[in-house]
């Protein structure tokens, strides 16, 4: 058996963190070293999810920083919040560790920090680690070039009621792929709000619609509509494990890479579409 990729999971008590920990048990190429939790979280409230053996791996970032012995791990997988993710990135910079970044909602300044960090450590960043949605990213490049000029383009996304950023990082990425393929300025093309007398639709526009309801994991639709036909590209995440499985594959992949900012498309380059 090959050497296992040793990981730390950040945001370990969140939705994705719990699933990631569960998926590490099934993956023979991954070894969980630690699971990061916030300082103000009481692990006792999560007893139903973890066995005693697992709970020994839980640690706060502050306590991780205090460890004098060099920790033998390869990569941190982070699904947390923008503010906490930046702390994780700074820790990885200081300790020369790789990072799989799945957090969304970063502002412009935080994106700059990520870009600068990638000059010194390997980072793979994706708003969506589903293999399926990343294949759609690849397909979308070609479809946009063929249909984009003469079509009205709309992106509709739906997520659970607790998601705090909108539109989703995946929806924004879909829009950016389309605008780049069409050589449009994304900031000018993106329409995030419609209300009142907005007039007729202008050319070179990408409309975004956001739905927040119930427990929806993630649904994304891209519409290309013209006077003759309508094409709809739809993706639905049925279980969050699809993101966890993709993130673990990314952790293995990034462990062999040099410094740089990567995405899932880089990882999937061998897939020809």
From Swiss-Prot:
Residue positions binding NAD(+): 11-16, 102-104, 126-129
One Gene Ontology biological process: lysine biosynthetic process via diaminopimelate
NAD as UniProt keyword: yes
Superkingdom of the organism of origin: Bacteria
Keyword field: Amino-acid biosynthesis, Cytoplasm, Diaminopimelate biosynthesis, Lysine biosynthesis, NAD, NADP, Oxidoreductase
Pathway: Amino-acid biosynthesis; L-lysine biosynthesis via DAP pathway; (S)-tetrahydrodipicolinate from L-aspartate: step 4/4
GO cellular component: cytosol
Gene Ontology MF: a single term: NAD binding
Top class in the EC scheme: oxidoreductase
Record-annotated active site: 159 (proton donor/acceptor), 163 (proton donor)
Localization, UniProt: Cytoplasm
Binding-site list for (S)-2,3,4,5-tetrahydrodipicolinate: 160, 169-170
Pfam families on file: DapB_C, DapB_N
Catalytic activity, EC: 1.17.1.8
Catalyzed chemical reaction(s): (S)-2,3,4,5-tetrahydrodipicolinate + NAD(+) + H2O = (2S,4S)-4-hydroxy-2,3,4,5-tetrahydrodipicolinate + NADH + H(+); (S)-2,3,4,5-tetrahydrodipicolinate + NADP(+) + H2O = (2S,4S)-4-hydroxy-2,3,4,5-tetrahydrodipicolinate + NADPH + H(+)
Keyword Amino-acid biosynthesis found: yes
NCBIfam families in the record: dapB
Record's function text: Catalyzes the conversion of 4-hydroxy-tetrahydrodipicolinate (HTPA) to tetrahydrodipicolinate.
PANTHER family: 4-HYDROXY-TETRAHYDRODIPICOLINATE REDUCTASE 1, CHLOROPLASTIC-RELATED, DIHYDRODIPICOLINATE REDUCTASE
Family: Belongs to the DapB family.
HAMAP family: DapB (MF_00102)
Subunit structure: Homotetramer.
Protein name in the entry: 4-hydroxy-tetrahydrodipicolinate reductase
The species this protein was found in: Buchnera aphidicola subsp. Cinara cedri (strain Cc)
């Amino acid at each position: 058996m090959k050497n296992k990729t040793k990981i730390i999971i950040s945001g370990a008590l969140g939705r994705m963190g719990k699933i990631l920990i569960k998926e590490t048990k099934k993956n023979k190429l991954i070894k969980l070293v630690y699971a990061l939790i916030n300082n103000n979280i009481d692990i006792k409230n999560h007893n139903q999810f973890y066995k005693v053996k697992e709970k020994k791996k839980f640690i706060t970032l502050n306590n991780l920083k205090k460890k004098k012995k060099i920790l033998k791990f390869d990569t941190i997988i982070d699904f947390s919040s923008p503010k906490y993710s930046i702390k994780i990135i700074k820790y990885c910079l200081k300790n020369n560790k790789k990072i799989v970044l799945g957090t969304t909602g970063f502002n412009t300044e935080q994106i700059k920090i990520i870009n600068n960090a990638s000059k010194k450590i390997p980072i793979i960043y994706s708003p969506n680690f589903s293999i399926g949605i990343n294949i759609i990213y690849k397909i979308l490049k070609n479809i946009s070039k063929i249909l984009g000029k003469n079509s009205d383009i709309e992106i509709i996304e739906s997520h659970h009621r607790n998601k705090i950023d909108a539109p989703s990082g995946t929806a924004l990425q879909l829009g950016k792929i389309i605008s780049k393929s069409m050589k449009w300025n994304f900031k000018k093309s993106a329409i995030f709000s419609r209300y009142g007398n907005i007039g007729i639709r202008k050319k070179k526009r990408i409309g975004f619609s956001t739905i927040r309801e119930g427990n929806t994991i993630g649904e994304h639709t891209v519409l290309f509509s013209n006077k003759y036909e309508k094409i709809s590209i739809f993706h639905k995440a049925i279980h969050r494990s699809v993101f966890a499985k993709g993130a673990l594959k990314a952790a293995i992949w990034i462990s062999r890479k040099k410094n740089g900012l990567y995405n899932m498309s880089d990882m999937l380059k061998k897939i020809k579409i």
